[in-house]
Amino acid sequence: MTEILDGAAVAKLTNEKTANRVAKLGKPVTLAVIYDPQNDGSRLYVGMKSKKAAALGIQTKDIPTAADATTESVLALVASLNADPSITGILVQSPLAKGVKEREIFSAVAPHKDADGLGATVQGMLFGDALDDYTVAATPQGVMTLLKHYNIDIFGKQALVIGRSQLFGRPMFALLTNADATVTLAHRYTPENVLKDYLKRADIVVVGVGKPDFIQGSDLKPGAVVIDVGMNFVNGKAVGDVNFDSVQSIASYITPVPGGVGPMTIATLLENTITLAENYQA
């Protein structure tokens, strides 16, 4: 029987621990969030993060970019936040305005303030399994927390990550590799027949491609663990990349959408923020 991985419940536990850590620190903890106010999704997401942060005792400084924002203007903003001792962590909410080079912006964030672990320095250390006191991108780290909470064995397992974005796929690949899984990274140019073969062999499948019904139960190895990072809207309803109903009869574990990875992402971002405060502001 398939067990549902309840991200909302695990996120609640994570948030309780974060709130206790914030209270114990006894100093202001502030997360600066740079975002494009023209993007409806970003505005909504930033609002959700700010509300949850406030509930945990974390202050937020939401900074909308100008309508005519350029790479240079956003880099200058990041530089000012890097130099501001009152700012604990910095989050660059993707997507930024058209024409702004996101990778340059991510990598301009000082490693000791990189709340989402997206800069080149931090991601390079992740791939070298040498993160020390830095943080990991919130979505893949949230997935790892979820797997750990449910005591899902990763060691020696065959894992398949579908999607190679800087926010999800690449750090997810590194985290699973560092946990001693044998990991395959598939992407939009992976031939369909090759992907089908990978799916049939994978013990753990983590997918985030933004395509509803991308994976069916018949694609999977019986007993596979399925982590759905996708978020799509079909007829006004939030759905993932996995056909949930068909996979339920095949998988041993599965995350629902909503209520799976999504709550873990926000909880992990705020957990990252208090970690930076403890390591670099205490």
UniProtKB/Swiss-Prot annotation:
Originating organism: Leuconostoc citreum (strain KM20)
Disulfide links within the chain: none
A single MF term (Gene Ontology): methylenetetrahydrofolate dehydrogenase (NADP+) activity
Name of the protein this chain belongs to: Bifunctional protein FolD
PROSITE patterns associated with the record: THF_DHG_CYH_2 (PS00767)
EC number: 1.5.1.5, 3.5.4.9
UniProt binding sites for NADP(+): 163-165
Domain of life: Bacteria
Keywords annotated in UniProt: Amino-acid biosynthesis, Histidine biosynthesis, Hydrolase, Methionine biosynthesis, Multifunctional enzyme, NADP, One-carbon metabolism, Oxidoreductase, Purine biosynthesis
Gene it is expressed from: folD
